[in-house]
Amino acid sequence: RPVMPQNFLIDPVATDINSALGCAVDEFVSSHLVEQLQESGVYRDEPLSIASSDFNLEPDQELTTFSEDKVRLTKYYGLVPTHLLKEAMQDPDAEDEEVVEFSEEDEENYYTEAMIVIANGGILLKAEKNPYMMQDRPVVAFPWDVVPSRFWGRGVCEKGYNSQKALDAELRA
């Protein structure tokens, strides 16, 4: 599904998704969706509070938004220090939970490709090694016009700027 540019966070010096340390989608979702995923076992069963409003994440800053029944969900896809990922994956409350084994190659690497889900800026709902077969990130970014060393590239309006200036000058002449 499409994500608004203000809700997509990426390493500032990255030129594409694969060269970034990681990327995140930061947006508000309905609290019942998070509760359903907690009940089904996808997310950890952590108590959630209502998220405070952040107008920078809202789709339209001019509309009045209601702060009830929404959770700020940050989904991070990228490299995480292996020792922190191991620590986050061990749930102290679960006795019969399966133990996730790291291969020797993962043990030697300082970073591991992972997927992290955080609610309201501080509640860890999910931490796991990258579950995708090709170990890629489930995000696709499309720059309209590629500009060297810039992730976002050049937009449609920026691309037409010089052409419009030339047409305006031609009409005035």
Where do the PLM segments sit?
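Extended alpha-helical, oligomerization-prone segments that build pores/tubes and scaffolds
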Residues: 1-173
